[in-house]
Each structure stands twice: as structure tokens, then as C-alpha cells.
């Protein structure tokens, strides 16, 4: 399909491979040459999920949820708490109670975490 003109891409989530690009600190998936991603910062005890990005032709197809699940499953497998600075991830966590146990106590002070990360040059 011609994604350059904004034509929506057909997507089967079962065929989408999400990878953890640790060098770039992001979970990513590429569909029809278009990259979707969630950026993060990893700390010894937590994973700060910063931003989710899905190109317009792929919006509304469940790709952001697929990326979010991959990030949260990674956090669980590595015994990391999650700090969701990204509004999409925060909303996802409110809707999916099965991931509530991953929330960091710092979740309630997202602004202070964001400021701390920014002031230390991590954001």
C-alpha cells in the first residue's frame, strides 16, 4: 500500500514482531517500512516509559497496545517497576489491571520523576 499518501495499512498483530532496541532505549516494530516505538530509560530497579509513537497510517490498529504489552512484559521478566510518563501507557495501565503490580511507588509523583530525569540529562 502507498503509505506516503496516508493510505491506511492493513495489519495483522500476530505478524508484528516487537524488539527491544537496548542501544536506542526503545521497543520498536516496523510494519511496511514504518517504525512504531516506545522510548524508555532503564534504571537498576525500574523502567521509565517516556513516549509512544505510531505513524498515522498504523493508528487505531492495536500497535501501541502491542508495544506497551511488550515493554510491560519485559519489565515483569526483569523484576523492574514501571514509571509511566507517557499518557498512552498510563491510560493502558488503568484499563489493564493485570499490570497494576508493576507500577512503581514513584507513579504518584510522575512530575518529580520527569524533573529528576531531565535535570540529570536523561530525558
Per-segment meaning from a language model:
Residues 2-37, 42, 46, 56, ...:
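Terminal substrate-recognition subdomain of acyl/acetyltransferases
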Residues 53-59:
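A short, internal acetyl-CoA/4′-phosphopantetheine-binding micro-motif in the GNAT/acyltransferase core
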Amino acid at each position: 500500500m502507498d503509505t506516503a499518501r496516508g493510505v491506511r495499512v492493513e495489519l495483522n498483530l500476530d505478524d508484528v514482531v516487537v524488539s527491544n532496541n537496548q542501544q536506542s532505549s526503545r521497543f520498536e516494530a516496523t510494519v511496511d517500512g514504518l517504525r512504531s516505538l516506545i522510548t524508555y530509560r532503564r534504571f537498576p530497579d525500574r523502567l521509565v516509559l517516556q513516549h509512544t509513537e505510531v505513524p498515522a497510517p498504523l493508528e487505531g490498529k492495536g500497535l501501541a497496545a502491542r508495544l506497551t504489552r511488550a515493554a510491560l512484559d519485559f519489565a515483569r521478566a526483569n523484576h523492574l517497576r514501571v514509571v509511566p510518563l507517557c499518557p498512552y501507557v498510563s491510560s493502558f495501565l488503568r484499563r489493564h489491571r493485570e499490570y497494576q503490580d508493576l507500577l512503581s511507588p514513584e507513579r504518584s509523583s510522575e512530575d518529580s520523576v520527569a524533573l529528576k530525569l531531565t535535570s540529570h540529562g536523561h530525558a
